[in-house]
Amino acid sequence: MRVLFAAAECAPMVKVGGMGDVVSSLPPALAKLGHDVRLIIPGYGKLWSLLDIPSEPIFRAQAMGSDFAVYETRHPISSLPLYLVGHPAFDPERIYGGDDEDWRFTFFASATAEFAWNSWKPQVLHCHDWHTGMIPVWMHQDPEISTVFTIHNLKYQGPWRWKLERMTWCPWYMQGDHTMAVAMLYADRVNAVSPTYAKEICTSEYGEKLDGLLNYISGKLRGILNGIDLDDWNPETDKALPANFSASNILGRRKNKAALQSQMGLDVKPNSYLLGMVGRLVDQKGVDLLLQVARRLLAYTDSQIVVLGTGESALESALWQLATEYPGRFAVFLTYDDYLSRLIYAGTDAFLMPSRFEPCGISQLLAMRYGSIPVVRNVGGLVDTVSPHDPSKQTGTGFCFDRFEPIDFYTALVRSWEAYRHRRSWRRLQIRAMTQTYSWDRSAYEYENMYKDVCGVKEPSPDAEEVEKFSVGQDADPSLKKAVVSDSEK
């Protein structure tokens, strides 16, 4: 099959969240199954210095009344064909943000559709998150191109319909409130990035006001778990580590722990219980829970904590405050650094993911691969990947809690700290975690089956009256409504 991946991110060049890892790692796993898989992303300014890009494009056209060009290069790791949509709107190095974000990604979706129609024509166009959400709408009546839409994070839903109608061509048959909604309605298959998240988003608690719509399309909704690249993330061969190690010879972790403690300004104590967190510093990731329990944990246990990431300024400031209160025991590094992230996975004893919601999560898979035991909330993909430790049966791979409450998180942390003090049992726990196999090969087979189901098949148009039942609607420009109210008050 010919498959084109369209996304706003692609690791390692363009990565903010887990979507970048998926778009980088899933295509080569599919290519190993014999498929012709290619990728298309916006031609962000920084890519021209990172990749070998020919000066002449392979395709020129117009989208939304503006000229664009498509350049062909190769992905630096997989060597798969990588297409870049060149346009001045993508010249800045930023990926997200800015007043033009809605226009930029709607334009990217439009340019991708033009490219798929008139240049390299895929059988399956695999779209990722709202940035590509209009593509399934435009492809809905093309019998030669089927669409798959992957939900990485339902919280981010893109521009409302009234704004889409101002920016671009919206077909007469289009239903739905915003870009995320129309993508789910018109894609031939929709999938979430874990089985549990696929179920959760059909409930009011996690559905982000789209649970009614998701139940309406549940017949074409799937849950496919993400994986990790086992070659890239391999503690036996990882060149970023001071000492390599494996499940059968775990001694190298001691050297990595000492190196991490030294580099982060922590007291170099081999027996301290070292906890790590890597990721976006936002409420979704449960950083506020960590802030509420950290002082008590540090007061009553011999723990140390290291945090790596960037995010909301209030959370960053609160983490800095903890670092100043507990020098040598709490460290924070406000950036993303691949080398440091690998050292945290390889040097910490446990890894923290107390998420409010978690579509899949990659970090817990990497932590287990490197022998750092996850302490997670039972939500989303964390349910599918981390099983609770049972010391009496010597089963499980981590420590889990249910409610998003400080006391529940703290209790899980104390249980993990107590387990850490029983070193032989802890080593067996580490070995169980390290021998889990969440490779992309398994996920690729599931995606391949979904592609086979959908290839050459077009879903019927959604019923307008049924869709209207699920509208939460901002169906007109709010500024126009204000203007009408003002006129009536005169």
From Swiss-Prot:
Pfam families according to UniProt: Glyco_transf_5, Glycos_transf_1
InterPro entries hit by this protein: Glyco_trans_1, GS/SS, Starch_synth_cat_dom
Biological process terms in GO annotation: glycogen biosynthetic process
Amino acids binding ADP-alpha-D-glucose: K15
Biochemical pathway: Glycan biosynthesis; glycogen biosynthesis
Keywords on record: Glycogen biosynthesis, Glycosyltransferase, Transferase
GO molecular function: alpha-1,4-glucan glucosyltransferase (ADP-glucose donor) activity; alpha-1,4-glucan glucosyltransferase (UDP-glucose donor) activity
Family: Belongs to the glycosyltransferase 1 family. Bacterial/plant glycogen synthase subfamily.
Name of the protein in its database record: Glycogen synthase
Origin species: Prochlorococcus marinus (strain MIT 9211)
Lineage, top ranks: Bacteria, Bacillati, Cyanobacteriota, Cyanophyceae, Synechococcales
Gene this chain is encoded by: glgA
